[in-house]
Amino acid sequence: MTTAENGAAAAAERWWPSPFGADDELGMLNHVDDGKRLEALALVRRGRMYDLGRVLDEHVPVFPGRFFRQTLVTTAHHANPDGGVGDNGVNWITEQVTATHQLGTHLDALSHLQSGDRGYNGWTVADLAGTAGVRRLGVEGVPQILTRGWLVDVPARRGVERLEPGDVVGVEDLAGVEPTPGDAVLFHTGWGARWHDAEGYLDGEPGPGCAVAHWLAERGVALTGCDTWSFGPVPPEDPARPFEVPQILNVRHGVFVVENLDTAALAADGVRAFALLLTHARLRGATGAWTSPIALV
């Protein structure tokens, strides 16, 4: 099948308008309401906090064409060589960052993926893409998130140290996980242990399969994520259908995805349910945003 035929086939499989409305841009996050936030906070008993975000620097694992560069700017010191401004000698240091938000621990906006030339709610790339960013489904419209979270520790369930590239997390691995609409379900595969070996980390990945994607969507899960650089097994279940798992979630169902999570401590302590707080910068027109989510128990 040619690229054009693929695009035509994708367009023929209508997944729009969204059940939340033809103009909806929030997808399953519509389920996260005041009641859901109170439900999440009720899980906090000890005050223990787990930081699920990775440190960003120039060594972050990235594929060609993506990078992170930070340059220190000491403009104030250059302009004020005599010791600073005012009698108190105030001075300051700032930095400039050049990077894509599609690296490190980040939240994908619903504008990130498409099926053919159509994305969430049927909007075409022409509808979405502008010169400086997307016109719709930008991450600036994604609310800050507080919801109930679940952790699926797959290595613990299978009695292994970690999963390997192409290993598929199946619905059977979700036994005992009972999300309700608006919940978040995160996956620990152990792959994140390779984070500091960029070449090894990017050399494939394990992850939830297509059956799990449909399982999450059927239950109204608002957010999911994994300790891997994408979401879903690489190599994929079907070699002819790469990155189909996040495509199902993001494009067809409006389920948000977080990548490059650090779930090791959460898994090591046996935490399975928690309050998840995920905040992000409101970057107009961006397809994603860096985040450092926290789990509270």
Residue ranges of predicted features:
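Active-/binding-site microenvironments in catalytic and ligand-binding cores
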Residues: 1-297
